[in-house]
């Protein structure tokens, strides 16, 4: 695999994806970020088995491929690179070479085939809602959202679309009626 991206695009995508990398896990592959350049776009995927994030990065694919790299090490390398184009190249043993101007880093990688993939989500027609309406919906339920992130699912709100109607659900964790 060989891809070329700007540092700013890489850093933005990696920092977003880093939110789904667990700090402690019994599965080392979950500490990785999957770089997938097997199609015509570059995808970064992270997954902690509760939360999964996929970002698409603008860049050039010179050789198609896929590799899983340690997400925190990869982020620290990208963060310290000069503001220029970054080349990421892997060999047949999944070792990655990251170069930017005079900087060159070699880090071991893993096969992307071992990575825990995200489920496919059908993306139908987009829903348009006014900012005022969305703000009011969130304002009316924000009090019930968990403050700590022991369970990440409880720190958000669920929006469902059924029969052209928007259903808004907030899981009451702090404020429950008994």
Q: Where would I find each of the regions flagged by the language model?
A:
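Structural preference for solvent-exposed beta-strand-turn elements
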Residues: 1-166, 170, 174
């Amino acid at each position: 695999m060989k891809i070329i991206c700007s540092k700013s695009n890489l850093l933005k995508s990696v920092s977003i994806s880093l939110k789904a990398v667990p700090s402690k896990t019994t599965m080392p592959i979950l500490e990785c970020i999957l770089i997938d350049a097997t199609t015509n776009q570059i995808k970064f995927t992270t997954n902690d088995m509760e939360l999964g994030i996929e970002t698409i990065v603008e860049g050039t694919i010179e050789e198609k491929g896929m590799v899983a790299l340690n997400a925190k090490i990869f982020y620290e390398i990208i963060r310290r690179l000069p503001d220029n184009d970054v080349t990421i190249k892997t060999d047949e043993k999944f070792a990655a070479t990251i170069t930017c101007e005079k900087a060159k880093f070699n880090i071991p990688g893993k096969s992307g085939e071992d990575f825990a993939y995200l489920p496919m989500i059908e993306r139908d027609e987009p829903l348009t809602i006014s900012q005022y309406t969305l703000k009011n919906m969130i304002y009316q339920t924000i009090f019930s959202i968990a403050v700590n992130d022991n369970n990440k699912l409880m720190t958000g709100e669920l929006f469902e679309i059924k029969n052209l109607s928007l259903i808004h659900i907030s899981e009451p964790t702090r404020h429950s009626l008994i």
